[in-house]
Design a protein with these regions (language model features):
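Membrane-penetrating hydrophobic segments
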Residues: 2-13
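Catalytic cores of secreted/periplasmic lytic hydrolases that degrade extracellular macromolecules
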Residues: 15, 21-189
């Protein structure tokens, strides 16, 4: 009888652990999906066919996920307060918040401002020429041009890993689970 009670207790702990794990994982996925929606909103502000609208949403989401620690801003309170999802530093008279290390982290009114600034940086800064030239080859090729973005020599590998393991599966399952429906008038064609 004691063994059965012990098994029931362990089963209960296992189920509780599984529920907790799934809840945490779903929370991270929800943050990512919410940010992806905002990226798409910002990209829709640009003319169709423009360079800004061609930058893959998954590319932008991957950079933001890496720079924010999967949108949790753990240990990056200043970046969180500044709505800075890309670690962009202020120049000239741009609004900023000082970090504990003395850097001037650019401050944005909202996450859309941060996304616009990142798109503009990648589009206009000569250092990201290789990234822009790879735009038609997809995010993983674009990452190769981002080695100048961070001091970490493994930055492009980190981007590729986060893309393959976190961002790409969201896009794949979203398209799989929620197929686009044709209007009723076109369904019988």
């Amino acid at each position: 009888m004691i063994q059965i009670l012990e098994l029931i207790k362990l089963l209960g702990l296992g189920i509780a652990s599984a529920i907790l794990f799934i809840t945490i994982a779903m929370s991270d996925i929800t943050k990512t999906k919410d940010f992806i929606k905002v990226i798409d909103e910002v990209k829709s502000e640009y003319p169709e066919g423009s360079l800004e609208s061609k930058i893959p949403t998954s590319f932008i989401a991957t950079i933001a996920a890496v720079e924010t620690g999967n949108f949790n801003f753990k240990g990056a309170d200043t970046a969180n307060k500044a709505n800075n999802f890309f670690g962009i530093h202020a120049t000239g008279d741009q609004e900023f918040l000082p970090t504990s290390g003395g850097a001037k982290l650019r401050a944005f009114e909202d996450n859309k401002g941060s996304i616009r600034a990142f798109i503009n940086l990648v589009k206009s800064d000569e250092r990201y020429k290789d990234t822009i030239e790879a735009i038609d080859k997809g995010p993983q090729e674009m990452f190769k041009g981002m080695s100048v973005y961070a001091e970490n020599p493994d930055y492009t590998s980190i981007l590729d890993n986060v893309y393959r393991n976190r961002i790409q599966p969201i896009f794949q399952t979203e398209n799989f689970l929620l197929p686009k429906r044709k209007p009723i008038t076109e369904q019988m064609d």
